[in-house]
């Protein structure tokens, strides 16, 4: 089955052609980082306009690189949510028009399911698997019990981990996006600030990062730190975040049995985090997608769509789909 997929949930415009839930034939991603870095974060209205400007070009380039004609497509998949509603609608309408013109079935996919199935591209997912999704908008621990059977075990009560990175980077004056900036600087710093490890006193598997962010804001507001001291803050902040993610994951594994641990989402591209998880959980098969499949891109939507189309008992078979910005499991 050849699937054309479109991803526009936030600030990446992406189109991909995949085959049989495994092979990535093309995967074109147009990033808006340059546009949003000027504002220190994603501006929803600007993101929507950029998607409108680039979606046709990205779609055409994806088909051309795959050497696939529209008539050869078996299914058109798109991100239905969660995400920014304006951004979602650009991708949804593009997919619906394409499907209608070429008489192809269309299928809306949960963006988070896409992140999970990014792990399938270069590996084989086994069930049950424990999944940690860490991105700019989500921090969740999930039990993947079967292809589409997912149980939420833990979630963030406030800021997602990627959001915390962006805000701390902005507090320190290092810009956007905060994830890669702080990760790089943290490796040049010393972990000398004893920041709180939030929510570790709680017995549940949930997360909270707003308090950590606030403590850094208060610290920076009261002191005139030099560059090296700010770099040290990056190191201590990152150590705190990774400690919490590792400890919460360990708690789940003490209570439940899983065949694999899947770490996915944009923050899974973090060098220190990847290294730490591979070291801490060496007794378990740990799957972390390649860097190119950690962030938002349409290949993961196409892979997820294959299994959703194959195993979902029923779904909307017409061309009337709506965006769901708060879609969850």
UniProtKB/Swiss-Prot annotation:
GO BP annotation list: tRNA threonylcarbamoyladenosine modification
EC number: 2.3.1.234
Major localization class: cytoplasm
Manner of cofactor binding, per the entry note: Binds 1 Fe(2+) ion per subunit.
GO cellular component terms, semicolon-separated: cytoplasm
Binding residues for Fe cation: 111, 115, 296
Positions with a binding annotation for substrate: 133-137, 166, 179, 183, 270
Top-level EC class as recorded in UniProt: transferase
InterPro entries referenced in this protein's UniProt entry, alphabetically: ATPase_NBD (IPR043129), Gcp-like_dom (IPR000905), KAE1/TsaD (IPR017861), TsaD (IPR022450)
Subcellular location, record wording: Cytoplasm
Top-rank taxon: Bacteria
Gene3D superfamilies recorded: 3.30.420.40
Known catalytic reactions: L-threonylcarbamoyladenylate + adenosine(37) in tRNA = N(6)-L-threonylcarbamoyladenosine(37) in tRNA + AMP + H(+)
Positions of transmembrane segments: none
SUPFAM superfamilies: Actin-like ATPase domain
Record-linked CDD domains: ASKHA_NBD_TsaD_bac
Molecular function in Gene Ontology: iron ion binding; N(6)-L-threonylcarbamoyladenine synthase activity
Pfam families according to UniProt: TsaD (PF00814)
Protein family (similarity comment): Belongs to the KAE1 / TsaD family.
Function noted in UniProt: Required for the formation of a threonylcarbamoyl group on adenosine at position 37 (t(6)A37) in tRNAs that read codons beginning with adenine. Is involved in the transfer of the threonylcarbamoyl moiety of threonylcarbamoyl-AMP (TC-AMP) to the N6 group of A37, together with TsaE and TsaB. TsaD likely plays a direct catalytic role in this reaction.
Protein name: tRNA N6-adenosine threonylcarbamoyltransferase
Species, as recorded: Phytoplasma mali (strain AT)
Lineage per the UniProt record: Bacteria, Bacillati, Mycoplasmatota, Mollicutes, Acholeplasmatales
């Amino acid at each position: 089955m050849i699937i054309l997929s479109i991803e526009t949930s936030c600030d990446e415009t992406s189109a991909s052609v995949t085959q049989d839930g495994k092979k990535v034939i093309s995967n074109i991603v147009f990033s808006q980082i340059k546009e949003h870095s000027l504002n220190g974060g994603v501006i929803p209205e600007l993101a929507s306009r950029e998607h409108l400007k680039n979606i046709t070009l990205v779609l055409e380039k994806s088909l051309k690189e795959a050497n696939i004609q529209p008539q050869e497509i078996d299914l058109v998949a798109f991100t239905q949510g969660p995400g920014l509603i304006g951004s979602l609608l650009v991708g949804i309408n593009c997919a619906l028009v394409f499907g209608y013109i070429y008489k192809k079935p269309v299928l809306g996919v949960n963006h988070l399911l896409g992140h999970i199935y990014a792990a399938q591209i270069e590996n084989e997912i086994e069930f049950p698997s424990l999944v940690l999704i860490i991105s700019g908008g989500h921090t969740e621990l999930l039990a993947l019990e079967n292809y589409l059977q997912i149980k939420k075990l833990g979630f963030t009560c406030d800021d997602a981990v990627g959001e915390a990175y962006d805000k701390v980077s902005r507090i320190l004056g290092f810009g956007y996006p905060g994830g890669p900036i702080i990760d790089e600087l943290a490796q040049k710093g010393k972990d000398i600030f004893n920041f709180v490890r939030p929510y570790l006193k709680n017995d549940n598997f949930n997360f909270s990062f707003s308090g950590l962010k606030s403590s850094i804001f208060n610290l920076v507001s009261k002191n005139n730190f030099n560059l090296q001291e700010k770099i040290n803050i990056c190191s201590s902040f990152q150590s705190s975040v990774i400690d919490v993610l590792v400890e919460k994951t360990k708690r789940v594994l003490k209570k439940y049995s899983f065949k694999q641990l899947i770490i996915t989402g944009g923050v899974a591209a973090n060098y220190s985090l990847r290294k730490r998880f591979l070291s801490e959980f060496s007794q378990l098969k740990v799957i972390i997608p390649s860097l190119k499949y950690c962030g938002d891109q349409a290949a993961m939507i196409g892979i997820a769509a294959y299994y959703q189309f194959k195993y979902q008992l029923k779904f909307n078979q017409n061309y009337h789909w709506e965006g769901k910005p708060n879609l969850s499991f």
